[in-house]
Every structure is written in structure tokens, then in C-alpha cells.
Amino acid sequence: MANVVVVGAQWGDEGKGKVVDIYTEHADDVVRYQGGNNAGHTLVVGEEKVVLHLIPSGILHEGKRCIIGNGVVLDPEVFIQEITRLKDKGRLKDDRALLVSESIHIIMPYHKRIDIAREAKSGEKKIGTTGRGIGPTYEDKIGRRGIRLMDLLDRDVFARKLKENLEEKNVILEKLLGDKPFTFEEIYEQYCGYADILRNYVADTSLILYNDSKAGKKLLFEGAQGTLLDVDHGTYPFVTSSSTCAGGACTGTGVSPRDIHEIIGISKAYVTRVGSGPFPTELLDADGEKLRQVGHEFGATTGRPRRCGWFDAMVVRYAVRVNGLTGVALTKLDVLNDFETIKVCTGYTFEGKPLADLPANLAVFEKCEPVYEELPGWMSDISGARTFEELPEKAKSYVKRLEQLIGCPIVLVSIGPRRDQTIIISNPFQDKV
């Protein structure tokens, strides 16, 4: 038995969806544990491209149970839209193959309006929110004002909580943000309609996962975003609002830490970031644009162009430490095919002095200078390789050097968007990483 957590080891968009899709073959349950529809997973199945924002990637596999845990925040409208699209494609034939925690917090229309209005008023201090209402929903969760799915299913409880929230939210919208308020009626009936559909998917998911793990079933936990976007361990305040690190898999599902056996971090062979915040290896030249175009670096959720830079070993080494990574899956190695020289950041300096680790102080992080090591490129198409030995020597040397720098074994190498364009060195469900 092995229960595996998959986390992003950089600033998100590392290719977790593809890796989760591959690992799903070996799992019984696939579980989302944090975030919301602010993150997109892009999967390529045969000739079919599927983008999911809420539903776990495992939904494309027959016979797997997909679970959305209590640590996620749920937009009912988006959730229902994804279900409809999947059913239109002939997927999700059994509704009970997809379960949602009864304790999950619900994204309300006022959350989205507040999110957008705040960002509009931020000027140069923009965080880079997707405007999906994720942050304000987590605020209400922590402030104990949130509306959970179990509340939504009880019309009387929902009505009371909605009225209480609107008294406060309308003041914020009108007086502080200069936006229009909501009426009770326009939200209540719409969300009661959502509740009638959601009722088919509600469950005590923590208990289900406990029983499945106890019975020897294999659990796969699918993280969203990345380590450097974690609300506690990321580049605060340029972070998301949830726990993206491996610890979030426990708090976001109700699964015991003792029931987590392997933790795999996903990292691109270079690095990208969306939105504002420090990014020491960012490339603002032709190399950065080349990475963006060849790697199709545009957000699955927002369509925004991603900032691109050379691989940052400091970032991934930090992810190894705070997550307790047992292995790293390296994605998009093929994007580097046509670079004669590839740079790798091995460390930072601040005011001329080397730093031992990532600085927590944002003002320091923004002024860090990367220390680079240059490696020769392989200048050939590697997308046809199916074993590590089939890669060009210079490509193998690049992977091995990254492994040395991050202090963690690389267990998978992705060399293209398709599932078969993957080199599995070690499988966390079958091998001891």
C-alpha cells in the first residue's frame, strides 16, 4: 500500500495534471485538498484536450473515485459546468464516482465581486488574483462566517447565514469598494437550485478516505498551485490563500499524516510564474520569450502569459525541505531542446553575500541576484525517448545535475504533452522512492 501526495515545487503550472493522470492508473481514490477553480489542470488524452479547474484529474479514468476535500473552496456554478462538460464527452457515468466533502466552503457571488473590486483598487500593489473569489471565501472560512455545503443543503440555515453575510458584505461593497450590493433574492433561489444538483455528490469524505486507506486502497492527493504560492511558506503576500504544501493534504481532507507515504514534487525543467512577486531567474529577453512560446506558457485559467526563467535550484531545494519530498517529477524537458546553452541557478546573493536559503523577507527576495551555472544544451528532439538511457548524453547530464543541486531523486521526466511522452524512473506506488 502507498498513499501519495503530488505538490507543485515551484510557483504552480508545473504540469501536475499530467503526472497525476499517469499516477492515477495505480490509485483507487484521487483527491483534491486545497484551492478552488483558480487553478487549471490541462490533460491530453489521445487527441482530446481537457481542462479541469475543480474536479480531480482522475475523473478521466474509469473505475476511480474522485474526491474534493474540505480544504477546497467550491464554486457551484463552475462545478456543475465541469460535470456537464464531462458528461457531454461521455465521462462521469456514475455520479458516486465523484464525491464532495459536506464541510467544503462555498464561493458566493459577493466573494467574486469583492475579489475583483479589491484588485481594481490596488493599483501597483496588485497581487495578481484570478478574480474567482478564492481569497475572500477563505477569509470567511477563517473568520467563521463561511457558508459550507452542509449549510447550503438546508434552506433555513442557508437563508439565515446568507442574510447575516449580506449585511456585512453589502457595506464592504458599497462603502469601501464603491461597488453595487446584492439582494437576498437574487442569490438565494439561484444557490438553492445549485444545492439540488450538488446533493447527489455530497459525502463524509474524511470517513470514506479513512476506511479506504484502512482497507488497503491507494490514495493519490492532487495539489493545486505550488509551494512558493503557499499562504504560509510562499512569497507572501504574492501567494494564494490556502496551504499548497504537503501538509495541506492532511488538513484539507482529514487524512492522518501517518497515512501519507510518498510525496512527489512537480517541477519544470525551467521555471514560470503568473502574476506579481519576486522571481530571481526571470528572463525578460529573447530566451524568456522563446521559453514562453515553445512551452505554450499561458495560463489554463486566465490565459495570461506566464513569466519565464531558468531553473532555480534554490526554489526546488526549498520545496524539498518544506514538503519532505521523496521524489521530483521533472516536466517539459523537451522545451529546452533548441537551447545551445542552458543556465541553472545554483544560489542567490544579496548585497554581494551568498544566502543559505530562500529569504522570508520580501524586500530581500526581490533584490536577490541569481548565481548561474552554464550547461551545454543537447540541440535535438527528445520527445521520442521512452527510457532515460535513450536521452542524449547532455540531456541526461542536465537531469543528473539538477538532481544533485536539489538533493532529491528525480523519479519521472516528461518530454512532451502526451501521456506516452513520459519516462518513469521510479513509481511511488510500486517502488520505494
UniProtKB/Swiss-Prot annotation:
Q: Name one GO cellular component term.
A: cytoplasm
Q: Does the keyword GTP-binding apply?
A: yes
Q: Where do the annotations place IMP binding?
A: D13, E14, G15, K16, N38, A39, G40, H41, T130, R144, Q225, T240, R304
Q: List, separated by semicolons, the cofactors it needs.
A: Mg(2+)
User: What are its GO biological-process terms?
Assistant: 'de novo' AMP biosynthetic process; IMP metabolic process
Its keywords, alphabetically, are:
Cytoplasm, GTP-binding, Ligase, Magnesium, Metal-binding, Nucleotide-binding, Purine biosynthesis
> What Gene3D superfamilies would the database entry show?
Adenylosuccinate Synthetase, subunit A, domain 1, Adenylosuccinate Synthetase, subunit A, domain 2, Adenylosuccinate Synthetase, subunit A, domain 3
Alphabetized SUPFAM superfamilies for the sequence: P-loop containing nucleoside triphosphate hydrolases (SSF52540)
Question: What name is this protein filed under?
Answer: Adenylosuccinate synthetase
Species the sequence originates in? Geobacter sulfurreducens (strain ATCC 51573 / DSM 12127 / PCA)
